[in-house]
Amino acid sequence: MKYQQLENLESGWKWKYLVKKHREGELITRYVEASAAKEAVDLLLGMENEPVRVLGWIDQHMNPALQNRLKQTIRARRKRHFNAEHQHTRKKSIDLEFMVWQRLAGLAQRRGITLSETIVQLIEDAERKEKYENHMSTLKQDLQALLGKKE
């Protein structure tokens, strides 16, 4: 495994994930009967700061259909947590309008590179163009000075 598992921290993440899913209306317990499900959820809500009990609750009460999604969520969260420790692996997010994202994704796909690489290429292209335009402007001014013309 690439990233160290931190039981207490990850238990907190699991608790938050399950509470979020419950608030979104998903069935987080294995119980069909509403009263048993409510009782189990109330028990979970009461153990926010008790990581060992959260793991026990998961083993005893959690809906088996959530098992894989919970594992994937925690694995992704663990990766983001450890990557955030180093500036070069830290990820940032930006908000894009859908049409902008769609065009950027299409360009990235045509070039066969990631969205980040596409953005870097576009920035480098713009910087080269700006440098070229400045160089051409300077050459034009120098040429006009040599020819003795004023604008």
UniProtKB/Swiss-Prot annotation:
Pfam families: MatP, MatP_C. Transmembrane segments: none annotated. The keyword Phosphoprotein does not apply. GO terms for cellular component: cytoplasm. The keyword ATP-binding does not apply. Its main location: cytoplasm. It is found in: Cytoplasm. One of its GO terms (biological process) is cell division. Disulfide bonds: none annotated. Keywords: Cell cycle, Cell division, Cytoplasm, DNA-binding. GO terms for molecular function: sequence-specific DNA binding. Belongs to the MatP family. Homodimer. Required for spatial organization of the terminus region of the chromosome (Ter macrodomain) during the cell cycle. Prevents early segregation of duplicated Ter macrodomains during cell division. Binds specifically to matS, which is a 13 bp signature motif repeated within the Ter macrodomain. This is Macrodomain Ter protein. It comes from Cronobacter sakazakii (strain ATCC BAA-894). The lineage of its organism: Bacteria, Pseudomonadati, Pseudomonadota, Gammaproteobacteria, Enterobacterales. The gene is matP.
